[in-house]
Amino acid sequence: CYHMLTNATEMLIKAKEGHYAVGQFNINNLEWTKAILLTAKELKSPVILGVSEGAGKYMGGYDVVVGMVNGLLKDLDIDVPVALHLDHGTVEGCYKCIEAGFSSIMFDGSHYPLDENVEKTKELVAKAHAKGLSIEAEVGSIGGEEDGVVGMGECADPNECKQVADLGVDFLAAGIG
């Protein structure tokens, strides 16, 4: 019986041990969130609910998102692990999600020079882990569009990846072109 948000690291460790994948699906309204949670329950599958900063604003703010998801977990009797994850967040967005009650954050510092990305990531790792959250960081640009911003995609330097990974992040998004 879960009915509460789960740290994404714990769920992914179990997935690796059990040789299965965990999907992350980005949400932007009640209907999508409800559909994803009911499907995860029916399939007995853990799930990560991703929220972009734009979607968080659209839904009324991060406190609203956390309240909606927690309410659905309880009212729909969701009995599988669920993580609520900020997707491609800014420093400010990460801090807001930590305070609002997200269980996981992703800091996208890929547009900063490496030393600045490392400094900001290190601070966020300490804050996130102190509150029991998992944290993902990015090195190199992941191609695609997020909230109207188009990333061309670039290959991350393996040495830079190691430098950021060694900061204690739980997951690393590395640009591969």
Regions picked out by a protein language model, each given a short descriptive name:
Residues 22-26, 84-85, 106:
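Short catalytic-loop micro-motif centered on adjacent basic/acidic residues
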Residues 1-3:
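Short, Lys/Arg-enriched N-terminal segments with co-localized hydrophobic residues
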Residues 19-22, 146-147:
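Short, basic, glycine/proline-bearing loop/turn elements
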Residues 6-14, 29-55, 60-79, 88-177:
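Alpha/beta enzyme core
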